[in-house]
Amino acid sequence: NYIDFLKIIITEDKSYFDQQKPLKNKRLKKLRSNDKNSPFYLFSQAEIYIQWAFVRIKFKEYFLAAYELQKAYNLLIQNEELFPDFILNKKNIGVLRILLGSIPDEYNWILRVIGLEGSINSGFDDLYSVLNYTENYEKYNIYEDEVIFYLSFLEMNMRDIKQSKLSLLNKIEDCCLSSDLLVFCAARLSNKIGDNEQTLRILEQVKPSNDKINFYYLDYLYAMSKLYKLNFVEAESSFLRFVNNFEGDNYIKSAYHKLSIISFLTDSLDKRIFYQNKILELGKSFIEEDKYAEKQVKKRKIEDKDLLIARLLFDGGYYQKSLNILESINQSALNNYNLTEYYYRIARLYQKLNYSKNDILDAFYELLALENSYNLYYFPMSNLQIALVYEKEENDEAALIYFQKTLKYDAFDYETGIKKSAKAGLNRILDD
């Protein structure tokens, strides 16, 4: 079941998903024929339900996913009552607590259906306690990679603690770069901490093999890293390798959007038009990156090349280079749309370059004083960043205000991710 779960998650192969569905109940039946006095009896059944729930979410089967999460949670709670010292219960309960603790308000019905209260802080405590066991007790070693994967994904998306990301990155580099799934985690973690050179080094260690599921998303990540370094030739080649080989739907529009950006920056007008048409024709607008790509091509906004290059350098962690370019831009030549991004990018660079708290906050406040006539994500994101600044200062009252302000915005790019981060921030403070 685990192999099917990973294959479906990685390849997004809908036909394989449909083909394997009937096997879920057959596998559960086999598990139920085992020793009922074992702590693995209910735990293993919960694993099956959780894996299928995550796969169903990938294909938007939300109601069935909610049902399966409820089944998994009830089995785990029952198992915890029967075997309170069985540490592996905390693995899945921890994941569920974190994910449900950050769930957007429009999906609160899932919490009601499952009857589980999310708690981000206690969820992380659960997972780190399991990781400790996997490292120190031989019989739990086989779960170490999985727990590191969960923690990496959740630390990237649910918390803003650089040291935690560094610690997980070091663990992966020490033990696990033979696993493409953990290569993916290491690449994303190094990008999150702003070290694009390390991301490239990690991805360049991937060796193709006929024995592995093709993980084409690694080509996408490699292309992104080359784009951040302004290596347009290699970036274009890797994006094309991704779109020509990956048979799923996610990141296709995003990849073609990046190809159109490369064409714009290299003055290849015909190729830009070709790639923009592909954005509208191929892939689906399910994940935030693809929604953004489709919106951008439909808006037909006039981009500023220097501002775009500064954005790419920023995303790759080349912060001083990005700031140097921004400081060379004539602000009076920017339209209102681009001027908003200019102020936002300055504020974010002040953060990354460790300017004083007052300089950072003043830069964000300057942006928020502008009129949000384009419904841009820079405004809710600025409120979110202000909240995070206050949270680090342990000024919980001010942080709560700005997390709540973030949640009041609607209909903007990256809305799901930004609101999830704001909700997670609220819950972190309220948990304490």
Task: Pin down the residues of each PLM region.
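Residue at a conserved register position within TPR or TPR-like alpha-solenoid repeats
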Residues: 4, 11, 49, 56, ...
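Short coil/linker segments at helix-helix boundaries
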Residues: 2-174, 291-295
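Solenoid-like repeat scaffolds
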Residues: 33-36, 81-82, 112-117, 132-137, ...
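Single-residue signature of alpha-solenoid repeat helices
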Residues: 20, 27, 65, 72, ...
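"A position-specific structural signal for the A-helix of alpha-solenoid helical repeats
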Residues: 3-6, 44, 48-51, 92, ...
